[in-house]
Structure formats: structure tokens, C-alpha cells
């Protein structure tokens, strides 16, 4: 794996607050939390953006958000899943370095031991954004109840009616729409 959302550069657009746009080849560096553009000469340039700039890649909108979390960092590039008045859903694409799992039994060393290099693994998750606060979406229903952000009875009703799966984006979007209106 790589520290990039997609190792290849994709056609994208940078949309500035004043309405100006820049189209070109763009990719996201998830570790440095910045965007990179590839010039016509093949030169790769990292670009710093603020929370007023939107980046569109493959139909998805990304934006820098001030998460202000000790656990997830001050800022993060989030993909906008749905933005509504009372509650929004964002995806936080992340990668982490993970060492390969080694077998329990090892052969005697020959001096030519091959150590496996760590690899970049997807480690992304969703955030609810409520009143400018970012709450990580848990993958377990009980943990969602413990967050105490939704009325428990309404949540139970929604869960029964909609087969809530906290790992599926389309189900989370339905949940956000439901609680935005109720």
C-alpha cells in the first residue's frame, strides 16, 4: 500500500471560496494530510489548503476540517457524505502503517532472515458533525446509544425499520437524514 488515498493522480478540481477553480491531476496524501498536484512537466507539488477550499476528485468532495481532537488530530481532510442543517456525515480516509503478522513458529535463523516491511493499511472511519463537534461513528449499536446524541426511542424505531448497519455509508446517510428532520 501507499500513504495516498489513491497512488495514481486523478482528474480533479480545486474550488476556491471566491468561485475560482483549478483543474488538474490531484491526489491526497493521507499521512501528511495535504493534497498534491502533478504539473504538466510531471513535477509533484504538495499544496496546503484551508477550510474554505473544496477539492473534487472522482465526484467526491473533500475539505479540510478543524476536528480539534486529541485522538484524531487538529485538522483532517474529510470526504463529505452528506451535509445537512443539524447533523452531517463525513468520511475520514486514513492509512496506518501495520507490521505483517508473523507466524508463531520460526525456523532457526540462517543469517539470511527476511523481515517483512510494514504496509499501509486503510484505517478510515466516519464522523458525525453536530454543532461544529466531530464525533466518531461507532461500529456497534450499543456504543452509538452511549454517545447519547440521538433520542433512544427514535433510534430503536429507526433501527428496526431500516436495518441499521453502522459500517455502511448509505445506511449512515439514511440515519443522518432521519435525525436531521426529527
What is the predicted role of each segment?
Residues 182:
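Short arginine-rich
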Residues 7, 28-29, 159:
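Aromatic-enriched hydrophobic runs in primary sequence
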Residues 15-141:
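Aromatic-patch recognition
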Residues 5-15:
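A short, Trp-centered hydrophobic/proline-enriched beta-strand micro-motif
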Residues 1-3:
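N-terminal secretory-pathway/extracellular module detecting exported/lumenal segments
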Residues 111-179:
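A short, solvent-exposed beta-edge/loop patch
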Amino acid at each position: 500500500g501507499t500513504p495516498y488515498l489513491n497512488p495514481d493522480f486523478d482528474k480533479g478540481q480545486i474550488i476556491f471560496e471566491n468561485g475560482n477553480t483549478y483543474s488538474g491531476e490531484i491526489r491526497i496524501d493521507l499521512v501528511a494530510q495535504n493534497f498534491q498536484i502533478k504539473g504538466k512537466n510531471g513535477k509533484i507539488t504538495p499544496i496546503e489548503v484551508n477550510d474554505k477550499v473544496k477539492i473534487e476528485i472522482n465526484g467526491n468532495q473533500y475539505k479540510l476540517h478543524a476536528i480539534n481532537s486529541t485522538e484524531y488530530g487538529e485538522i483532517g481532510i474529510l470526504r463529505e457524505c452528506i451535509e445537512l442543517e443539524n447533523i452531517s456525515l463525513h468520511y475520514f480516509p486514513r492509512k496506518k502503517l501495520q507490521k505483517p503478522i508473523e507466524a508463531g513458529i520460526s525456523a532457526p535463523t540462517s543469517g539470511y532472515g527476511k523481515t517483512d516491511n510494514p504496509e499501509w493499511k486503510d484505517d478510515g472511519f466516519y464522523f458525525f458533525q453536530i454543532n461544529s463537534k466531530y464525533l466518531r461513528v461507532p461500529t456497534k449499536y450499543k456504543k452509538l446509544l452511549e454517545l447519547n446524541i440521538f433520542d433512544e426511542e427514535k433510534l430503536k424505531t429507526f433501527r428496526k425499520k431500516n436495518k441499521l448497519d453502522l459500517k455502511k455509508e448509505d445506511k449512515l446517510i439514511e440515519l443522518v437524514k432521519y435525525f436531521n428532520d426529527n
